[in-house]
């Protein structure tokens, strides 16, 4: 059996923890990505919901993918350093197409602040500010 292809080689994540499936758009300060929520996804609970922690991780991966794209696709190790005003506003369930939108607010050198939100069918299901930090 062939290994699944990584659509985001610039992220250090591998299946099953690579949550994003597709790049929809990348601009100068923002990016839009897609996660297809499947019953086969090991992150999905027995109740068919994607837990808030994984929604937050998808937002962080969107920020990392945007940074890598802005750096010419260069993979840069980093981590989620801070989460502010994060709110879950609805459920994310099997069958949903989770749209991940990130907008870069400030770049502090080694740390970047984003406003991030997750939407399903145009409805915001989660949002907040996240900070990603790079060790270099």
Q: What is each of the regions a protein language model found here?
A:
Residues 2-14:
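Short aromatic-glycine motifs in intrinsically disordered, low-complexity regions
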């Amino acid at each position: 059996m062939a290994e699944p292809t990584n659509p985001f080689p610039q992220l250090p994540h591998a299946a099953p923890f690579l949550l994003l499936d597709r790049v929809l758009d990348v601009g100068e300060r923002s990016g839009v990505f897609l996660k297809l929520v499947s019953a086969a996804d090991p992150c999905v609970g027995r109740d068919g919901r994607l837990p808030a922690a994984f929604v937050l991780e998808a937002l962080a991966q969107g920020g990392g993918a945007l940074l890598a794209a802005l750096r010419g696709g260069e993979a840069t190790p980093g981590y989620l350093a801070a989460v502010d005003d994060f709110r879950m506003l609805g459920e994310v369930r099997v069958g949903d197409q989770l749209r991940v939108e990130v907008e870069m607010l400030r770049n502090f050198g080694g740390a970047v602040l984003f406003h991030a939100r997750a939407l399903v069918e145009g409805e915001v299901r989660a949002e907040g500010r996240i900070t990603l930090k790079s060790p270099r």
